[in-house]
Amino acid sequence: MIIKKLIPKSLKKIYHFTFAKLAAFVYGYPSRELTVVGITGTGGKSSVVYLLARLLESAGWLVGATSTVFFKIGDWEKLNNKKMTMLGRFQTQKMLRQMVRAGCKVAIIETTSQGIEQYRHLDIDYNTVVLTNLYPEHIEAHGGFANYKKAKGKLFATRPKTIIVNGDDANAEYFLNFSAKNKIKFCITDLQDLKLDWQGIHFFWNNTRFDLPLLGKFNAYNALCALTIAKSLGLSVEEIKKAAPVMQNIPGRLEFIDNGQQFKIIVDYAYEPKAMVGLYETIKMIPHQKVIHVLGATGGGRDRARRPILGQIVGEQANYAIITDEDPYDEDPREIINQVAEGALKVGKKECENFWKILDRREAIAKAISLAQKDDLILITGKGAEQAICVANEKKIPWDDRRVVRELLKNMSEEKSKYPVGSFVDLFTSEKGVRRARAHCVLQADGSVACTGDADILAALERGVSVLIDGEPHYYQPQDGIKFLLAVSAHFSNPYLFASEIQKL
């Protein structure tokens, strides 16, 4: 890394090329002993890698895979904790050699445009290369869409045996013009009688019915892509049908987190505008009340232009938006948050009313949970199953949105257990440190809270005034005071009680 930083920009390509050649030589060109499938595109790459790996494995193949989501070598696998989609040259070649030693038949490699530009694909003997789709993204890194498309094209120029392309994509013909023995197009019309609903995607493919627990049209494309690749590798439709039930539960992709709470929580990787729009199209099929969305944007100079666009999309679609830190790298995370917030403000969101800026991502998620009521839907986007937050000086902070959500839900459940039916607290509103109104609240058997005392406190609570909670145990909750108290009844049907419902004790 130190050597790389010292190399002049004009010599960087030579550096990357030389080390790519050296890495393949050191590890003995392992890809020559594998059937290598390279998956590239703007969206869906990781999902296709995951679905294909599961499908082939279920069909009895030993599989290796590398992607944003996970690494897999035969029976061994783990989530990707490197914060890199395509590993460096030596790491990639080493992993390919390990796949050979493990007896893997196929290696599936998520291959990025930036990885291609740095020659990480060099001397990998791709048997099959696949394009999921292509649309404007990572433009700042490549200096324009034309350069971005050209970078993707370099993978197809490796003269693979088979090229597989999304035929519905506007750029399909560009990639189909590259040389290959077999050229295959897949189109959404290949899925006959396609139906999308809350339970998944349902269709006929090659006169065979499939019912997959994957949500959304984009996952119909991802599944179709994986099925098409599997068939091109030699699996029969009957073998694919038998193996297909494993095509589900992609980590950090529309992943539901369920701890028994009465509202839904989805963690998703969507980090750019098109994916965000697709996510909102998909959740229309999910029964829900209000939408509470936690999001951020990536730093490090990555596509700054999309930041206010993300804020605008969420500002228009969500009832509540909470903008937080994501991966700031060397940028000021507050400035990134402000740029995203511009979009939300533009479409009428009002700070501290239906939109918040919270720097700490854990606090932002906790805020979303505190806002959620029965049948609401919380979206947490931008990181998916990523295992770290990237900050300044190339440091990585261990992180997993899903783990944090589970911890917060567990804490909420533990707080609930501290308040048996009949327990009470005294509430005091606090504005600028001055105690004002007071109420006495008792938890009822049905999960509601009965309050008596100064009714002004209830109006104050609705305004979001801080609350001092006295009783057993003692707590101070600086935000959403009554929410903290009512976490005990969050699983019941009537957790909220305001002025019109005051009961005399």
Each model region followed by its residue ranges:
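ATP-dependent carboxylate-amine ligase
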Residues: 2, 6-13, 225-238, 242-252, ...
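Beta-strand/loop nucleic-acid-binding surfaces
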Residues: 447-458
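Short, charged beta-turn/beta-strand-edge "cap" motif at the junction between a beta-strand
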Residues: 472-477
